[in-house]
């Protein structure tokens, strides 16, 4: 949707085909599902006119604290005064509402909700997509943005490297006694990371955080079946006194964790963005931001090409997009996979080595700055839409 809004604002005509019903995606209530929006992604929202609507809905991330199993020692990433936050946390519903509202105001966007593409054709001069209701759409470029199981990617025969972590992420919303102070906690255990992400207080002033707890696949069903009392006891044991007394603010849910990376992200008049191109572990909260970087780069490649008289699906436009995004996406994917494996090594010796390493990072300002820039998405050659407004 972000890609469609950016292209429409640049003057392109866009069809958006969505198999889901917008009403279901924006249903009332906090379900615990939330996303971290990095500094660079927030800049993108600013350029697209989304920031004024979203700003009061998000909780700034003032710092990120990293700890190994509640043992002594941690790394705290906190920007200098005047540098702003490390990002913002939003309930996914708030992001969807803002995107749907912005898209509805764009006359260049044709919306096809509750629809699926049943046939795709690509050729030297254009593409077509036949919808489930028989409608045939024609364009110059086809973009696959349907997520990890992208049928557009599969239809194009693009090879994918993938593996299953055999873990699931348990998602829940927590209400808690202590204010979170804008700190996002990443507590690592051999079974997987345990993240506490700061959310806005509710209308009554109740402090809230989103929980993302990684558990082994074999244990996930048992965790989901626990009574609320037993589940909260397990959560307290994992988080210590970080947030004080806790209660459930939203029901539990889960999703499987896996890695995949495509051999290429373009083909004839085809581009892949987001999870259709690369799926990573949520360990650093970079999945959505990686997709937004794809969108910003593709918008710039297409709009620059249009100014030169090239159509959006021109091979030169797509080659530039692939050169720009392939290495960054691969590096982020490998880094998150490496962190997952590093902190998954059990034993006291491994824990000691990790804590010594964290202590070293804590003392080395240039290295801490590099990690913070990566988390904020402001390193490397950025699309103009990711630069400050």
What is each PLM-predicted segment?
Residues 45, 126-130, 136, 141-245, ...:
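Conserved FAD-binding catalytic core of PHBH/FMO-like flavoproteins
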Residues 300-389:
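C-terminal helical "tail/cap" subdomain of flavin- and related membrane-associated enzymes
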Residues 3-12, 44:
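A short, Lys/Arg-enriched amphipathic alpha-helix followed by its capping loop at the start of a domain
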